[in-house]
UniProtKB/Swiss-Prot annotation:
Hydrolyzes diadenosine 5',5'''-P1,P4-tetraphosphate to yield ADP. It catalyses: P(1),P(4)-bis(5'-adenosyl) tetraphosphate + H2O = 2 ADP + 2 H(+). It comes from the Bacteria. Its EC number is 3.6.1.41. InterPro entries: ApaH, Calcineurin-like_PHP_ApaH, Metallo-depent_PP-like. GO terms for molecular function: bis(5'-nucleosyl)-tetraphosphatase (symmetrical) activity. It comes from Aeromonas salmonicida (strain A449). This is Bis(5'-nucleosyl)-tetraphosphatase, symmetrical. Keywords: Hydrolase.
Length: 273
């Protein structure tokens, strides 16, 4: 059995299937791990959701910012934008079934037997692994419960940008969501910054990638994430794997296989802007 981790798909269904063929992924025995942002910007968000859902327990995916935004659009919180290419999904007969399934995906996923943790954007430098797990469960329970509409209506915003155990209510939930789904850079004091989407060498002075501010402990799991295409897979750390390589922007879709540490990529030139 192989554990195959894939970066942001964003509706690029054909590229995903081509990559899985290249990696010889076998859904009868392998497990597909997806770093979130299954939908938006690419041509086939509907096919992508249907396929991943059809894999059942052979697919593990976490929520990304585009996935949450889709849920917000469906709930009337945000407008449907043409550039997101979600119209077919919104009009699909199985829309509600797919969105309910998506709403029940986690913010953080872990392998039950291997030292691997997966999120979409990252884990706050202020959190250890236990805090990250607990924070993820807090928001997941809201998304899966009666308060999910309230949460979607109030999740947008950049503040608070710093963590405190005293945070409560929507301010606490917003920080948790932003950390797991939007974060790239932090200020040196640990506060989150959301405007810069460039790579570390092009960033504004005073900012550092979130993973450079995380201390490494020997018993920490390998952390796998997506979201940050400008990294092109480079974190400079063996314990932190970045897998978003900009498929929807015409670069490539990348798969990392845990068992042999193989990186497999397929070019996606048809999406070049």
């Amino acid at each position: 059995m192989a554990n195959c981790f894939v970066g942001d798909i964003q509706g690029c269904y054909d590229d995903l299937r081509r990559l899985l063929d290249l990696a010889k992924f076998d859904p009868a025995k392998d497990v597909l791990w997806l770093c979130g942002d299954l939908v938006a910007r690419g041509p086939d968000s509907l096919k992508t959701l249907r396929y991943v859902k059809s894999l059942g327990q052979r697919a593990v995916t976490v929520l990304g910012n585009h996935d949450l935004h889709l849920l917000a659009v469906a709930d009337g919180v945000a407008p449907l934008k043409k550039k997101d290419k979600l119209q077919a999904l919104m009009e699909a007969p199985d829309r509600d079934e797919l969105l309910t399934w998506l709403r029940h995906r986690p913010l953080l996923a872990e392998h039950p037997d291997l030292p691997i943790m997966m999120v979409h954007a990252g884990i706050s430098p202020a959190w250890d692994a236990r805090t990250a797990r607990n924070c993820a469960r807090e928001v997941e329970s809201l998304l899966r419960g009666d308060q999910y509409s309230w949460l979607l209506h109030n999740m947008y915003g950049d503040l608070p940008d710093g963590w405190s155990e005293d945070l409560a209510g929507i301010e606490r939930y917003r920080y948790i969501i932003n950390t797991f789904t939007r974060m790239r850079f932090c200020y040196f004091d640990g506060r989150l910054e959301f405007k810069c989407k460039k790579g570390p060498t092009e960033s504004t002075p005073g900012l550092r990638p979130w993973f450079e501010q995380r201390e490494h402990h020997m018993d920490d799991p390998i952390l796998v994430f997506g979201h940050w295409a400008a990294l092109m897979g480079n974190t400079g750390r063996n314990d932190i794997k970045a897998l978003d390589t900009g498929c929807v922007w015409g670069n490539s879709l990348t798969l990392w296989r845990y068992e042999d540490d193989a990186l497999i990529a397929t070019p996606c030139p048809t999406h070049a802007k």
